[in-house]
Amino acid sequence: MGSLEVERKTVGWAARDPSGVLSPYEYTLRNTGPQDVYVEVMCCGICHTDVHQIKNDLGMSNYPMVPGHEVVGEVVEVGSEVTKFRAGDVVGVGCIVGSCGNCRPCNSDIEQYCNKKIWSYNDVYPDGKPTQGGFAGAMVVDQKFVVKIPDGMAPEQAAPLLCAGVTVYSPLNHFGLKQSGLRGGILGLGGVGHMGVKIAKAMGHHVTVISSSDKKRAEALDHLGADDYLVSSDAARMQEAADSLDYIIDTVPVFHPLEPYLSLLKIDGKLILMGVVNTPLQFVSPMVMLGRKSITGSFIGSMKELAEMLEFCKEKDLSSTIEIVKMDYINTAFERLEKNDVRYRFVVDVAGSKLYQ
């Protein structure tokens, strides 16, 4: 099919200001070019990053903004040069919809670190047209940033994997932490953390969930299958667990001290930061030096890793624990997410919702 020159309108739910309240918003999609895929959205997960963006917590939000970067939909049309997809395919779109294609990260298949990457929303294309996300009827996306959802995987289960799943999978893959028998810690048991437990267990790791309270102990051990549970304020138990973990995946999106968790790592252990925190984190250097420990970070994952992760989850029969809601519930869902009142990811049934009020 050739380039689709006609601009088409769609309806999304947009924030207009830092109040973060979403309401229906009609806008025009960019033209569908030869390399583009036109996708009708089926569902979209809600990520904590969406909260930061709609409320301008990072100081770089532009409005109107249609959030959503855990998007699953059906391909309706493809451009003349599209080779990866055809009409009827169920596909996913994650956090990024473009990159320069020429830099070292792009040439190394880690395009998520490209300095010119284009976010799925709250960004602009090279022609100046704003990007809008997946809480909408449709999207137009370059085929390079679209991934096939494996046959048999439910769309609503696949959606959170496009961010939460690959965010955990990527550092385990990159840092050589996929082999069976490792001992890992998951700090924070939210949308990303619960997938961390599931993926690490599927890789054959001994998994310890670390939390600030005891309230999620039964959930972590009985439902998610974690092997141990630590309350960070329990000094005796934290001391017993010192020098026991090969890595910790830190998913906490608010300020917290790092020293208690560095003490849990073995020599050469890694504390991998994933939560978006606006205030400086603190630690004393001997905590790192005396154990040759590393504090590092990881950001989502590449398109290659995204495809690998989806196949891994299909093979291991892994899925997100979700609550499905309609679009008219989205503001309540955001309020609940800010209170950590979700088990563990909201997914909006976009196709089954009335987008106009």
From Swiss-Prot:
Domain of life: Eukaryota
Protein name: Cinnamyl alcohol dehydrogenase 1
Biological process, per Gene Ontology: alkaloid metabolic process; phenylpropanoid biosynthetic process
Tissue spec. comment: Expressed in leaves, mainly in peltate glands.
Pathway membership: Aromatic compound metabolism; phenylpropanoid biosynthesis
Annotated residues for binding of NADP(+): 49, 167, 188-193, 211-216, 251, 275, 298-300
Catalytic activity, reaction form: (E)-cinnamyl alcohol + NADP(+) = (E)-cinnamaldehyde + NADPH + H(+); (E)-coniferol + NADP(+) = (E)-coniferaldehyde + NADPH + H(+); (E)-sinapyl alcohol + NADP(+) = (E)-sinapaldehyde + NADPH + H(+); (E)-4-coumaroyl alcohol + NADP(+) = (E)-4-coumaraldehyde + NADPH + H(+)
Swiss-Prot/TrEMBL keywords: Metal-binding, NADP, Oxidoreductase, Zinc
Enzyme Commission number, as recorded: 1.1.1.195
Pfam families: ADH_N (PF08240), ADH_zinc_N (PF00107)
Residue numbers binding Zn(2+) 2: C100, C103, C106, C114
Residues in coiled coil: none
Cofactor entry: Zn(2+)
Quaternary data: Homodimer.
Keyword Zinc: yes
Function: Involved in the production of citral, a mixture of geranial and neral with a strong lemony scent. Reversibly oxidizes geraniol to produce geranial at half the efficiency compared with its activity with cinnamyl alcohol. Does not use nerol and neral as substrates.
Keyword Calcium on entry: no
Gene Ontology molecular functions: cinnamyl-alcohol dehydrogenase activity; coniferyl-alcohol dehydrogenase activity; zinc ion binding
